[in-house]
């Protein structure tokens, strides 16, 4: 991963704001680069946290040493728009397209902002490759057609998320932008080859959060809501339900942009890091004024 070569001092001062000319370096494998967003009770960014206001635990232990701490404002947007076109969500597809179109208009505003569109059912299809062109993204959203990705029936959500994080986000710089997926689905998966853990793990590797616009499940006993909550919470994202409210949708998009554009970067050496590929659980908390801290649930140690 990449991070700015700007070191916080030992007195716990507020995070530095790197300028455009900051030097970048590649983080060694025995260091962890953690990005997170802090917001107050009103959902507004808290961009003045000090290092000594944070409590970080890596597998239950504080880090051996913090090497860098700064706030990165105006991160470039890297968005993957994933549209569920299976039969169970067909009634929601037109509304989902409208929201996805707003994402293109609202979030792709800077020359460095980019997005792709992936439609999925039993199989998945990239209907628009990476681009910063709002019109091209909107066209890719319109090309998410109900049933086209379902020649055999069924829905493979986990496989679609895996593909997005492995093949799309896996090919871009994980630390140079605010990476996230916007997933439109009811969460019902009955056709994936991989499981939800593989999807989550792959997104954690790619430093990619998942934001969900949830459709109501067809069955009351559906596992869909649980699946969507796990995908979002484990990657530092959210689940939204305000699909029918124009004001609610606007607020949801404001939250997504605030969380992805304004990020803290914390680079540290864990107390214990063996090169065994094991999962490290991250717990991060801050002062009361930072009511929500959006951070992924953990990371994987190097395998060798």
In which residue ranges do the predicted regions lie?
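Scaffold/interface architecture of coatomer-like assemblies
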Residues: 2-304
């Amino acid at each position: 991963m990449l991070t700015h070569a700007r070191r916080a001092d030992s007195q716990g001062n507020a995070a530095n704001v790197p300028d455009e000319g900051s030097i970048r370096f590649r983080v060694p494998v025995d260091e962890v680069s953690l990005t997170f967003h802090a917001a107050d009770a009103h959902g507004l960014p808290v961009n003045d946290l000090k290092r000594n206001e944070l409590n970080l635990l890596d597998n239950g232990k504080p880090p051996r040493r913090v090497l860098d701490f700064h706030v990165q404002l105006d991160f470039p947007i890297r968005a993957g728009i994933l549209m569920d076109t299976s039969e169970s969500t067909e009634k929601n597809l037109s509304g989902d397209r409208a929201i996805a179109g707003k994402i293109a208009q609202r979030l792709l505003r800077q020359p460095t902002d980019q997005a792709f569109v992936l439609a999925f059912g039993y199989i998945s299809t990239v209907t628009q490759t990476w681009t910063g062109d709002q019109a091209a993204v909107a066209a890719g959203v319109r090309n998410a057609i109900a049933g086209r990705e379902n020649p055999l029936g069924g829905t493979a959500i986990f496989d679609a998320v895996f593909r997005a994080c492995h093949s799309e986000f896996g090919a871009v710089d994980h630390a140079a932008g605010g990476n996230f997926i916007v997933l439109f689905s009811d969460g019902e998966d009955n056709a994936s080859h991989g499981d939800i853990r593989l999807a989550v793990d792959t997104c954690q590797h790619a430093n990619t959060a998942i934001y969900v616009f949830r459709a109501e499940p067809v069955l009351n006993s559906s596992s869909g809501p649980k699946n969507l909550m796990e995908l979002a919470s484990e990657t530092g994202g959210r689940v939204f339900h305000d699909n029918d409210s124009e004001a609610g949708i606007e607020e949801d998009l404001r939250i997504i942009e605030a969380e992805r554009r304004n990020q803290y970067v914390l680079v540290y050496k864990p107390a214990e890091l063996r090169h065994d590929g094991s999962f490290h659980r991250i717990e991060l908390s801050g002062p009361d004024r930072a009511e929500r801290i959006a951070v992924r649930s953990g990371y994987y140690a190097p395998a060798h």
